[in-house]
Amino acid sequence: MNPRSAGGPRGVVPPGSHEPAKRGGSEGGRPPWLNMRLTVVGSSGSIPGPESPASSYLVQAPFQGRTFTLVVDLGPGSLGALYRYLEPREVDAFALSHLHPDHCLDLCAYYVLARYSPTAPWPRQPVYGPRDTAERLSRAYDVPPLEAKDTDPGPTLAGHFDFHDWQATQQIGPFTVTTVPVDHPVEAYAIRITHNVPGGGSLVYSGDTGPCDALGELSQGADLLLVESSFVEQPGNPPGLHLTGKQAAEVGTRAGVGAVVLTHIPPWHDRDAVLAEALPYFPGPLSLAVTGATWEIG
């Protein structure tokens, strides 16, 4: 972590230990915290890296006497890492920023668990994502995209997941989730998650995007901006694809967010160099996403 990690901003408790949290939260399934919590499951950009799976994040909060868990993206390698924090069947819902493999492909592995594990069949979990998510993931696993018509969910992803196209705003458990399209070669969304309690915190996740006004507008006043920083400052970066650390920090400054966390840095870039490029352009707490790090927001 960089020197600005200490002494959290408004509504954000500084990142906790990078050691994996205990699975299942506290006794009875109730979390030992009251606010929304972000945990980094995987943060490697574009591919899994030697120190981290590809993109995946837990967003959790108390809800109806227990912990509600929203998994945001589930890239390659992240399902295995998820076991460090909870039993996978305890996931309440999934949110997919877009359908590039590094953000969604382990949902196919999750399907294997839901269908074949000793505790199967599992309840159908909601999956929120771009149009045709069910069809695209079904093709990836080479199973029929349509739900089976009998009582056995059978070899279909739609038999095990309840797919929803992203709307501008939706309620998911204790969260209001707002999405906007961002600038990427495929249908892609930035996601704002607000905890529905008095004084509840807000988190914005950029997904993958090049510079665009929509991300800044969605991020206005957020407590924490989890923002991709795939590029370094150099000539020839292609437009409409990714952000540099500097550009990510500038989004946070213009939007007046409380803290910035840089993520989605590919293994071929020096993470510390990306951080160094960003530091001069954001005046508040700024850090790198590290597997196992947590932030309390609210």
Residues of each region from the PLM?
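Cap/insert and terminal regions of metallo-dependent hydrolase folds
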Residues: 211-296
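Binuclear metal-dependent hydrolase catalytic cores
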Residues: 27-205, 210, 215-217, 275-298
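N-terminal non-cleavable signal-anchor helices
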Residues: 13-14, 222
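Intrinsic disorder/low-complexity segments enriched in small, polar and charged residues
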Residues: 2-13, 27-28
